[in-house]
Amino acid sequence: MERRVRVKSWVEENRASFQPPVCNKLMHQEQLKIMFVGGPNTRKDYHIEEGEEVFYQLEGDMILRVLEQGQHRDVPIRQGEIFLLPARVPHSPQRFANTMGLVIERRRLESELDGLRYYVGDTEDVLFEKWFHCKDLGTQLAPIIQEFFHSEQYRTGKPNPDQLLKELPFPLNTRSIMKPMSLKAWLDGHSRELQAGTSLSLFGDSYETQVIAHGQGSSKGPRQDVDVWLWQQEGSSKVTMGGQCIALAPDDSLLVPAGTSYVWERAQGSVALSVTQDPARKKPWW
């Protein structure tokens, strides 16, 4: 039986899990990975993956350090802001005490690799790297980080060319990174269209991630190969699936598993988000 989860209540119930050194906990770990991350957590490593990541700050601000078009830069994501990180962008989340963020990513395809890299200062020169098939980022990162801290590269600050890949599994992304935006301001600015029954994409159609805002109306599935995560923002809605009817109030969320038939009916005044990440929408990078 699928159950609704009230996001802020779930965060409070699991508050102890967000303290160092762990700092994160998964709400869902299916095709979609719905996780919440606290702080403080200052990192030097950069993560690279073939999928995209959604960031949303529930409490406080964070910094997402990225390597964009050959330049290191900081992307501030403030409380209430949402941000989509494109695939294949090296990124290093910097989180602070008394903050809480939502991160959404997807299960990796068997053919996909993740990378963990350390750079020489603020250059593009790679000091240390490991590439791996990611099944559980929470358990797989720590041993790699410890390996780096015990390495000759860490001690000397100089790379070992014999331990670096001659050719990457995929090219790094060269597209410009969008600015984070206030989710509430975006929804308020499109309220007339949403209440007229028009569903709107926050990030457009050029990504595998689809974050869709819905007003009153109805929609149905299934999505055969991907999960759908629903998050009620305002008003009410109800989801009928598997013989049960699940009512959603503000801040309630629900994961609809891949392949599940459902009908989602949204009342007048309802504003809600649906999130999917479909690797079939990946853009060729060659």
From Swiss-Prot:
Keyword Isomerase annotated: no
Keywords: Cytoplasm, Dioxygenase, Iron, Metal-binding, Oxidoreductase, Pyridine nucleotide biosynthesis
GO CC annotation: cytosol
Reported consequences of knocking out the gene: No visible phenotype. Mice were born at the expected Mendelian ratio and are normal. They however show very high levels of 3-hydroxyanthranilate compared to wild-type mice.
Reaction(s) catalysed (UniProt annotation): 3-hydroxyanthranilate + O2 = (2Z,4Z)-2-amino-3-carboxymuconate 6-semialdehyde
Annotated residues for binding of substrate: 53, 95, 105
Family to which the UniProt record says this protein belongs: Belongs to the 3-HAO family.
Protein name: 3-hydroxyanthranilate 3,4-dioxygenase
Record gene name: Haao
